[in-house]
Regions:
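Active-site rim helix/loop that mediates acceptor-substrate recognition in acyltransferases
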Residues: 22-56
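Conserved active-site alpha-helix within GNAT-family acetyltransferase domains
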Residues: 107-123
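Conserved GNAT acetyl-CoA-binding A-motif
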Residues: 96-111
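Conserved acetyl-CoA-binding loop-helix of GNAT-fold acetyltransferases
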Residues: 76, 82-95
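Short amphipathic alpha-helix that is part of the acyltransferase structural core
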Residues: 1-35
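Conserved beta-strand in the GNAT
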Residues: 49, 54-64, 68-75
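Short strand-loop junctions, especially beta-strand C-caps/beta-turns
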Residues: 74, 79, 104-108
Length: 123
């Protein structure tokens, strides 16, 4: 597995990663398209695309600062879910630096929030 940083919409991995992002998160949790495109060039914002054998398998959208890393969105292709790919990907990403990682989920009032919480607790 590799991590590819996207800094422009012209990157060939941007469109498939955005399609998975749009399919994986409710619209109220998504960044608007114009805002997403504008923030790509921010030095602390990392739009990472996880690839396996060159094929995109998920976005990991995060802020990487000198003091912490904050994950905004993380998704894995439905074909790879349930096979520990997401856990391995997050662990590999976390091992790349020694700053604390901040994860955020919504209150545990929806099925998706409960599932996300369980996933993060297993890490």
């Amino acid at each position: 597995m590799d991590f590819h940083r996207v800094t422009a919409t012209a990157d060939p991995l941007y469109a498939p990663a955005m399609a998975l992002y749009r399919a994986s998160f409710p619209s109220h949790e998504q960044r608007q398209t114009a805002s997403q495109e504008a923030i790509l060039s921010h030095p602390d914002y990392h739009f990472l695309v996880l690839t396996e054998q060159g094929a995109p398998v998920g976005p990991l959208l995060n802020w990487d600062t000198p003091h912490f890393r904050y994950i905004e969105h993380f998704a894995i292709s439905p074909a790879l879910r349930g096979r520990s790919f997401g856990s391995r990907a997050l662990q590999a990403w976390a091992d790349r630096a020694d700053t604390p990682v901040i994860l955020e989920i919504d209150p545990l009032t929806t099925d998706i929030a409960v599932r996300r919480n369980r996933f993060y607790e297993r890490l």
